[in-house]
């Protein structure tokens, strides 16, 4: 939004052209989102407490979690507000990739908000019925996937690139739509499954989102992409602003979500952030690298799939409890130890993922 204003003012007053620089707008984006989440955080927490929007805790989970009962939830609303506001202010809103990611963020946020509202306010333990949640996730996911496919301007935009190799790629064609759909919906639910401990989901989200911002900057630059032998996707660099806003909003939220948490993000935050990460990974053509960097989200999801599958087939459970973080809690690990070790794993995976850009 302010990019347009700067362009207009540049014709009358010199100096406003500086706002064309992507790096400056990314810095302003992260500072704006961080400032909003830090300043509004106490007010949001106070309002959630006044409205008695508190988290309900399962009786069959780790006993240490019972003390979390009543902790304000739906704090993801603060994250999304900060991200969207910063992006609207500092990103180029004529960029189709920015619009696609904003659409995913807002629509999946609404799905999560309805789910949280039914659970917490209406006291419906099931929240939004699973079939309707999946229906709306699928509808929104396919809308974006189809839109990106039909507006693709170069073959690179629908090609799957294999890391570690310079010239190994697969032109997906119409399968691009289904891959994009799976990335959006799959990681939306993966982040949601991971969001079970204080700060466990938001910090990996910030780290992976920041790494995607670096990749978006490189992929959107013809010189860097040619030098690194990676795909060049014109316009994708603008997503750096969104990724910066995500990092700022996430860090601001972590200030209040770190152990012991004063607020939880709820489905409104987890579903939206996971979907946003998924669609950004698709746009910058680094789906496989994204899988590597998002190893914690993948492991948490796989643990649930294995647990459910094993119980249905054999009547036995592989883990003491799924998702995986609960397994370690029931083994006697203190919650902060689980959280920090999962963060450390994410740091390693993100660094390895970024290293693949050069290892060709």
From Swiss-Prot:
Pfam families, sorted: Glycos_transf_4, MraY_sig1
Give the UniProt record's GO annotations in the biological process aspect: cell division; cell wall organization; peptidoglycan biosynthetic process; regulation of cell shape
Localisation: Cell inner membrane
Residues spanning the membrane: 25-45, 73-93, 97-117, 132-152, 168-188, 199-219, 236-256, 263-283, 288-308, 339-359
Q: Which cofactor does it need?
A: Mg(2+)
UniProt topology in membrane: Multi-pass membrane protein
Q: Among the entry's GO cellular component annotations, what is one?
A: plasma membrane
Record's CDD domains? GT_MraY
Q: Annotated pathway, please?
A: Cell wall biogenesis; peptidoglycan biosynthesis
Q: Looking at the keywords, is Coiled coil present? A: no
Main EC class the enzyme belongs to: transferase
> What domain of life?
Bacteria
What reaction does this catalyse? Answer: UDP-N-acetyl-alpha-D-muramoyl-L-alanyl-gamma-D-glutamyl-meso-2,6-diaminopimeloyl-D-alanyl-D-alanine + di-trans,octa-cis-undecaprenyl phosphate = di-trans,octa-cis-undecaprenyl diphospho-N-acetyl-alpha-D-muramoyl-L-alanyl-D-glutamyl-meso-2,6-diaminopimeloyl-D-alanyl-D-alanine + UMP
**Which keywords belong to this entry?**
Cell cycle, Cell division, Cell inner membrane, Cell membrane, Cell shape, Cell wall biogenesis/degradation, Magnesium, Membrane, Metal-binding, Peptidoglycan synthesis, Transferase, Transmembrane, Transmembrane helix
Mainly resides where? membrane
Task: List the GO molecular function terms.
Answer: metal ion binding; phospho-N-acetylmuramoyl-pentapeptide-transferase activity; UDP-N-acetylmuramoyl-L-alanyl-D-glutamyl-meso-2,6-diaminopimelyl-D-alanyl-D-alanine:undecaprenyl-phosphate transferase activity
The EC number(s) attached to this protein equal 2.7.8.13
Q: InterPro entries per the record?
A: Glycosyl_transferase_4 (IPR000715), PNAcMuramoyl-5peptid_Trfase (IPR003524), PNAcMuramoyl-5peptid_Trfase_CS (IPR018480)
Quote the NCBIfam families the UniProt record gives.
Answer: mraY
PANTHER family (alphabetical): PHOSPHO-N-ACETYLMURAMOYL-PENTAPEPTIDE-TRANSFERASE (PTHR22926), PHOSPHO-N-ACETYLMURAMOYL-PENTAPEPTIDE-TRANSFERASE HOMOLOG (PTHR22926:SF5)
Q: What does this protein do?
A: Catalyzes the initial step of the lipid cycle reactions in the biosynthesis of the cell wall peptidoglycan: transfers peptidoglycan precursor phospho-MurNAc-pentapeptide from UDP-MurNAc-pentapeptide onto the lipid carrier undecaprenyl phosphate, yielding undecaprenyl-pyrophosphoryl-MurNAc-pentapeptide, known as lipid I.
HAMAP family with a match to the protein in the record: MraY
Q: Which family does it belong to?
A: Belongs to the glycosyltransferase 4 family. MraY subfamily.
Q: What is this protein called?
A: Phospho-N-acetylmuramoyl-pentapeptide-transferase
Corresponding gene? mraY
């Amino acid at each position: 939004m302010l990019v347009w204003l700067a362009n207009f003012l540049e014709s009358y007053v010199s100096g406003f052209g500086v706002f064309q620089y992507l790096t400056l707008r990314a810095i302003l984006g992260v500072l704006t989102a961080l400032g909003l989440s830090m300043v509004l955080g106490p007010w949001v927490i106070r309002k959630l407490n006044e409205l008695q929007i508190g988290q309900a805790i399962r009786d069959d989970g780790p006993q240490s979690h019972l003390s979390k009962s009543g902790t304000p939830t739906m704090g993801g609303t603060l994250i999304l507000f900060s991200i969207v506001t910063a992006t609207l202010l500092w990103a180029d809103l004529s960029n189709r990739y920015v619009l696609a990611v904003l659409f995913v963020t807002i629509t999946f946020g609404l799905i999560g908000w309805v789910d949280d509202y039914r659970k917490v306010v209406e006291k419906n333990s099931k929240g939004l019925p699973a079939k309707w949640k999946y229906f709306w996730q699928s509808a929104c996911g396919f809308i974006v996937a189809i839109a990106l496919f039909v507006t693709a301007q170069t073959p690179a935009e629908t090609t799957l690139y294999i890391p570690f190799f310079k010239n190994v790629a697969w032109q997906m064609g119409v399968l691009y739509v289904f891959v994009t759909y799976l990335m959006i919906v799959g990681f939306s639910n993966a982040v949601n499954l991971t969001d079970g401990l204080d700060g466990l989901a938001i910090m990996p989200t910030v780290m992976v989102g920041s790494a995607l911002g670096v990749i978006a900057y490189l992929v959107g630059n013809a010189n860097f992409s040619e030098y690194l032998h990676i795909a060049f996707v014109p316009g994708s660099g603008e997503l750096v602003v969104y990724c910066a806003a995500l990092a700022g909003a996430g860090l601001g939220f972590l200030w209040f979500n770190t152990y012991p948490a004063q607020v939880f993000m709820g489905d409104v935050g987890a579903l939206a952030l996971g979907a946003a990460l998924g669609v950004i990974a698709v746009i910058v053509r680094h789906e496989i690298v994204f899988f590597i960097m998002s190893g914690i989200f993948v492991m948490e999801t796989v643990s649930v799939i294995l647990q459910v599958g094993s119980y249905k087939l054999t009547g036995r459970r592989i883990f003491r409890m799924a998702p995986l973080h609960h397994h370690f809690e029931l083994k006697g690990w203190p919650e902060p130890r689980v959280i920090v070790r999962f963060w450390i794993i994410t740091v390693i995976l993100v660094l390895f993922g970024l290293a693949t850009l050069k290892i060709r």
